[in-house]
Each structure stands twice: as structure tokens, then as C-alpha cells.
Amino acid sequence: MHILSRVGQKLYFLISLVLVFNTGVSAQDTIKRPLEKALEAMRSGYWYEAKQLAEADGKVARDIILWHEFRSGRGSPTELREFLQRNQDWPGLPYLKEKGEQVFFESSRNEILSWFDENPPISPSAATIYADALLEAGKTNKAELIVQDKWISEVMDSDLQTVYLRKYDVALSQLHDERSIELLWRDAFEALDDLIPLLSDDYKKLVKAVVALRKYKKDGVNTLINRVPETLRNHPVLNFARFKWRLKYGYDDRAFQLLYELSEKKEYLGRPEIWGATREKLARQLLWDGDYKASYRVLSGHFVEDAKLKARLEWLAGFIALRKLKDPNSALDHFQNFIEIVESPISIGRGFYWLGRAHEDLNNLESARRAYDRASENYTTYYGQLALEKLGRSLPYDIMDPNIKLQWRNAEFIQSTVFQAAILMLAAEENGLAERFLTHLSENLSEHNLLKLESFLSELDDPHIQIRFGKRQARMGIIVFDSYFALHDMADYQWVVPVDLLLSVARRESEFDQYAKSSAGALGLMQVMPSTAQEMAKNLKIPFEEESLVTSWKYNVLLGATYLQELSYRYRGNPILIAASYNAGPSNADKWIQHLGSPLDRKTNLVDWVEMIPFRETRNYVMRVTESLTLYKTLVLGKEIDHEFSEFLGSSAYFSFTPQSE
């Protein structure tokens, strides 16, 4: 059995213990666990049989089937209530509750009222059954408020929108204009088609103008805009459509002028977050084109409140101010704003490093040192390692010492049904689900219990689950090193490129999940595209077997390593270029070299080079891979790294390898 063979003797006791605790049946008594059979039945659509089969593995196993059932919009109201009472700490409950609303569609009025009085409807379709029940109970005002709220805030398909109009026409009659604005912001053109006849004359004109602009029609748009009454001529949704249209057709100066004027007040923008995403893309393009003043001004007055987007805008404004406009005072403000928003070690390290750079440019050397010191605390990150270099320090030698392993068998979380469900799923060969439950379990544990859980994961020895756990903790500001930089069995073998490179790429590509499949078609541990894998197999003179890219991690790593070897040769072993080309392709890497210079050229500012990569995914990828290289090198070699990080980034560290085909 795959899972038990992987876990081996180290966890055989645990699986037997938990299964005996739940079912009274030893793990030795059967080859295939009842839950495994139940999940097979469930995926074939036999829900009742699945629940019956799961019962042989205990109540928690049956709840696993119920968890899936409710998330599929099936089940009964009674079972849903009882499940949530038992399992208030299970993962994915918001989604489960939203999908679970469907079980009330054929329920009695009392059942509907009992549920939705305590759990306000999430979906607009559920709002209709709740409103109907309220109307039957004589609670007209509350019913109208429920449907009115959904009407002005939700996009619906044509059928549901028709239901709303038929059932609640009086309650909604004064809200059609307001709904049209929501639909315009969300480009919900199909829903707007049905709504237009119900709009006031003024809003009909507004909608027609905005839709024409958002569909980038050339002919007649000025006529449509001129028909919009003066009271709506400066509506934010119309101005956003005009802004996007002008950019589309090359009227950049007019687009920028409109943006600058509207950025004076938040209310002029209407929805700053929607403008903000366009600001970031536009600022990046202007930065690439060398128009630094315009790039910076585009980011000014954004009024964005969404934390992730605001952080990106503030950091980018700070970078442009410092590195391109030579304005460290303005940069300080932006980097401070960035630091106040972010929480993860990656972002904290980044923020304080650049704060230090701004202070350094202002000759505030003590302030710079303090900022670098704060950044260096996050030494597992790209900017943390650059900050260490600024301070003249090396990576802490103790990263080679494993975390203290605590006895986990007496941990409080052993009694948690979340943990027990994870163990049952491991025994049923459902590692992906087990990982989800284990990482969710970690979110509310004390630091002491986190270390106990880490000890369990270390004994489990599934690097994919360890990495997922480590990353989840890192996002919460906690580094559990042994999991965050878990080692895969590939470290025990010799490859055509150094194993630290393979570990770093695989950690980023698949998080050590050998069964990973991307939406683009990349497969396995190294996320190799089948066409690339076929070419590498041909170079190696071995058969190409696409299925083996997933079923055999060694085959996958062999072909991925061969491709990395070719990239190493092409880019003279440079870590930045190897990572960038593996993620975005050699053609893009070549374009960036032509535009930005080569990281191998000593005149090139390496830190700026990485930050100037046009693709956010690739910028992040390069940082995550290169930060891992020195850490994995330290872990694998068992000795301190004697080079500076920036020296390594600009080096030909992986150039001592020539392609097999040569």
C-alpha cells in the first residue's frame, strides 16, 4: 500500500493507534481501508453507500464523506447542523456553508428560517428561499431587505435575475439604477442586457456609453458619452471606462491626465481597488520604458485599502522614488507604509531592506543599520540574506541543526478530529486532503504544540506536507525551519546539476508534490512540460513516457535536471538567469538581458535587475529559488557558505556542467 509503505515503521504505530481508537479495527487487518473504499464510491456518485462504507472506519471517517457531500451541495439540513456542531474547527467551512445552503431548497419554512436566521444567506439563490420563508411568516420588511441587498451587490445569471424580478419587483423597483452600477464595475454585460429596459432614461444612457467603452468599440463612443446627462457625466464608472479606452487606443497623455485629476479624491475614483490593479500594470510598463516620473505619478493618490494591492503599490512607488528618481525621502514614506501593512517574513525582510537602502542614501547610517538588522532576522528570505551581507554577517550556522524534536504522541491535538481525519486520509492514500487538514490544524496551535506537530511531520517524512505546513506558518510570521526547507529523497542521489538547484526549483515548482499538474500542462516534481521532457529524453537517448513524469519522481527529476543543465550552459551557470528562464522561458530571459544587461556583467545592479523583471510571478520565482539555493547548499553540504549572497547571484556558480547532447 503506497501510503503505508512511504510512512513505514515510523508511523505504522500511529496509524494503527488512531484507527483502533476510532474503529476497533487494526490497520493490519485490511489492505484497503474502509475510508478508501468509501471515497471511491463517493467519486462514483454513490453517496449513501459511501457513508455506510466509511462508518467501518468510525465517525470521523463518515464525517469526511459528509464534508465532501455538503461541499457538493448535497445532504440534509439535519446532518448539516449536526456536522457543524461536531466539527466547528474543520477546514473550508465558509465554502461548505455556502454550498450547503442548497440542502435547504426543498426544506420546510421552519427549517429555512431556523438556519438562515442564524446564518445569513451567502448566495443570491439562497436569499430567495429565505425571503420566501420570511414572507410566509409575515416578515415582509426583513424579506425585502434580504433581496434588496443581493440585488445591488451580486451578479446573477439570467434565470436567477428573472426570478428576482418576477418575485420581488415592487421591492426592487427603485434599485435597478444602483444595480446597473455594480454590474458595470464588474463587466457583467449579459446581466445588463436584461436590466436595461428597467433603468431610468439617464442610467440607460450611462450604461450604453460605459458598455461601448468597455467593449472597446471605436465608432460612436463620443456620441454615446455626450448623451449621458451632466449629472452622470463624471460618474467614476464612466471615467474608468474612458481611461481604459484611451489606453487601449494609444491616447496615453489624455488617459494619464484623467487619472491624475481623479486621484485628488477617493470619491472621484469610486472603486480605488479596480483602478489600483491598472495603476500597477501601467506603472510597471512605464518603468520598463524608462518614463520614471510618469510611472511614479501613476501610483500617487491611489486610495487603495486592500492590503495586498496597497502593499504592492507602496513598495513599487518607493522603489521608483529611490532607484530611479533619486528621492530617498519620498521612498522612506512608501517603504514605511509597506512595512505597516505586511506580515510575512518575505515581505518584512523586503520592506526593511529597502528602508535601509533609503536611509543609506540619506547617510542615516545608524537608521540604515537598524533597518538591515530587522531585515536580517528573516534570513531565510532573499532580502534577509541581502541584509546580512550589508551587515557583514553570514547565515546563522545553527540552520544545520534540526529543530528540537518534541514528543508529539501526548499532544493535545491528537484528540482533535481534524488530526484524526488527516491520519485516516493518509491511510486512505489521500495525501492532498491530509495536507489540507494538517496545515489547517496548525493555524490555531500554540508555538509549543506547533513544534510537536512539526515533530510529527518530520516523522511522517512527506516533504510535500512539510513544505505546505512550513509555508503556512511562514505566512503567519513563524519559521519552522525543518519543514519550511524540507529535504526530498532526491538529495540522496547524484544528478547532472547540483542537488541544491534541484531542491530549490522543485520546492518552488511543485512543493515536492510528484503528482502535481499545472493548468498549463506542466507535470510532476519539477513541473516539466511534456514537450520539453520529450526533447530531454531524446537527448539522453531514453524512452519518453509522459505518464512516468507523474508516476516516477526519479524520471521526472532526471529530465528536469537535464533541462536545467542546458539552461546552466546557456546562461553560464548564473543562478538568476537559470531561475528566470526555467520559469518564463529562455526567450523572455534573453529579452531581459538585452534590455537590462546581464547579471554576469559586474556593471549590472543585480538587485535592481530582479526587481525590473516585468512578470510578477517570475520576479517572485527568482527570489524564492535563489534564497533557497544557499540554504539547501548549507543543509546538503553541512558547512557554512563562504561567499556573499550578491556575489553568488552574479556568479557562474552552476557553469561546470555541459549538456549531455554535446
Report the location of each language-model feature.
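Solenoid-like repeat scaffolds
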Residues: 51-60, 71-74, 82-91, 104-105, ...
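Bacterial N-terminal signal peptides
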Residues: 10-22
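Short coil/turn linking the two alpha-helices of tandem helical-hairpin repeats
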Residues: 70-73, 101, 108, 138, ...
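Structural register within alpha-helical repeat arrays
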Residues: 37, 64, 69, 100, ...
